[in-house]
Amino acid sequence: MASLLAKDTYLQDLAKKICAQPGPERQRSTWGVRTKGSEAAGAPKKKRKKTQKKSPEQEQKAMDHKTKALGKKPPTSSRPKNPMVSKQEKGLSSLGSPKDSQGTARESVFALDFLRQRLHEKIQLARGQGSTKELSAATLEKRQRRKQERERKKRKRKERQAKQQVAEAEKKEEPVEVTPKMACKELQESGLIFNKVEVTEEEPASKAQRKKEKRQKVKGNLTPLTGRNYRQLLDRLQARQGRLDELRDQDAAKAQELEAKMKWTNLLYKAEGVKIRDDERLLQEALKRKEKRRAQRQRKWEKRSEHVVEKMQQRQDKRRQNLRKKKAARAERRLQKAHKKGRVLPQDLERAGLS
C-alpha cells in the first residue's frame, strides 16, 4: 500500500507541473482597423504576400530549437485545435527526442499499471470478494476446497470424453462381419419374439377364418361351457344331461364312456385356463343373481324416469302460475292507471250496485 501511495503522489505532482506550465501566447494581429480617413490620407499600401502555412514537421523543429535554446520543455496546450495535427506532433516529438520519449513512455506504462490495479481492486470489491487479508481462515479453506473440486470434476470430464472418443474410434475401426446364415435368419424372421410369444404383423382374420380356428380348438367335438350367458349355459347343460339319460337307457356302457370322455375334455380345458361352468346348481344361483340385478336396475330406471317426469311437471306448473301472476299484475296496473285518470270502469259500477 505504501508503494501505491507513493506512486499516486508522484503522478499527482507530475500532473500539477504539466498543468502549471504556461501555454503558447497568441500572436497579436498587426492588422489595424481601417477607416475612410486613413484610406484617404495614407498612401496605397502594397499587398502582403500570403505566408504559406508551415507543415507540422517544421513547427515541431522550431519548437525543439526554442526549447533547446531556453533549456525548457515545449509548452503543451490544454486543448489542441486539430486532433490530427496534435497526434502528428506527438509522434514527431517522440521521434525527435529519444530520451524524453523513453521517460514519458515509462511514466505512461507505470500510470496504466497503477490504474489497472485500482480498477481490478474496485471490481473485486463490487463482486464482494475484496482482499484476501480481511477473510477468515475458514472462508479461505472453503474457497480452496471448491477450487480443488472444480479442478477434479474438470479432469474427470476430460478423461470421460477421451475414453468415449477412443471407444468410438475402435468401433469405427472394427467392421461387423455379416455371415450369410445371419442374413437368412433376419429375412426369415418376420416379427418379434417376446418370451416365446410371437408378435407378427398379420392382417386381421376374417369371420370365416375365426370360426374355423374356433372349431379346431374344440377338443373331442365338445364345446366348453364358458361365458356369462347363464341361461344359455344352463339350457346347454340340461340338454347334454338329457342326451346322457337317453343314452343310458339304451346303452349304459356307451353312456358311461361318453360321460368319462366329457369329464376328461373339461379337465383339458381347465388345464389351459378356461373356466368351465358345468355345475347346474351354481348356474341357477348365478342366473337368479343376474335376474335380480336386472330387476333392481329396471326399478331404479323406472323410478328415475318418474322423478324426471314429476320435475318437468312441477316446472311447467310453476311457469304457468308465474305467467298468471304476471297477467293479473299487468291488469291491476292498468286499472290503477285508469283510476288515476278518473275513469269509471264496469267493475266499479258492479261494486257500487249501479249496473
Curated annotation (Swiss-Prot):
Query: What spans are recorded as compositionally biased (Basic and acidic residues)?
Result: 54-67, 303-320
Annotated segments matching region Disordered: 18-104, 123-178, 198-227, 290-355
Q: Say which domain of life the source belongs to.
A: Eukaryota
Q: Modified residue Citrulline is at which positions?
A: 106
In which tissues has expression of this protein been reported?
Expressed in all tissues tested, including heart, brain, spleen, lung, liver, muscle, kidney and testis.
Q: Which UniProt keywords apply?
A: Citrullination, DNA-binding, Nucleus, Phosphoprotein, RNA-binding
* Localization of this protein: Nucleus, Nucleoplasm
Single GO BP term:
ribosome biogenesis
Q: Which residues form the signal peptide?
A: none
Identify residues that carry Phosphoserine: 136
| One cellular-component annotation, GO | granular component
Place the motif Nuclear localization signal on the sequence.
45-49, 152-156
Write down which residues bear the modification named Phosphothreonine.
223
The primary location reported for this protein is nucleus
Where does the record place Polar residues bias? 94-104
Q: Which GO terms describe its molecular function?
A: DNA binding; molecular condensate scaffold activity; RNA binding
What does the entry's PTM section describe? Answer: Citrullinated by PADI4.
Q: Which Pfam families match?
A: SURF6
Compositional bias, Basic residues, is annotated for 44-53, 143-160, 208-218, 290-302
Q: Which InterPro entries match?
A: Rrp14/SURF6_C (IPR029190), SURF6 (IPR007019)
Q: What does this protein do?
A: Binds to both DNA and RNA in vitro, with a stronger binding capacity for RNA. May represent a nucleolar constitutive protein involved in ribosomal biosynthesis or assembly.
Q: Which family does it belong to?
A: Belongs to the SURF6 family.
Question: PANTHER family from the entry?
Answer: SURFEIT LOCUS PROTEIN 6
Per its record, how is this protein called by name? Surfeit locus protein 6
